[in-house]
Amino acid sequence: RDIIKIKNSFDGINIKLMKCGSIEEALKMVTLAKKYNLKIMLGCMVETSVGITAAASISSIVDKVDLDGNLLINNDPFEGVKVVNGKLSLPNANGLGLKLISKNDSLV
């Protein structure tokens, strides 16, 4: 657990869902960071709306959010979380609410 190692050296952590591996692992990291009074930022890499929407699903429990990686690609075959008036807006559907909008063979 890197959080335990750095808890006295830093004021906060940046969780990237694609690097920690799962929503479940991210939630464990959030719990541990809160235990040590660390600030929590939820970040991302350049990725499709699948990863961004998954990360956005836990955004309400962190201090800061930077989830714009899907806005940096022009061939995202999915529709998920959107930015509305500067705030994340999750889809109103079951699960993550993702919608396949195009089958892009270049992503396979």
Feature names for model-found ranges:
Residues 64-66:
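Short helix/strand-capping turn motifs
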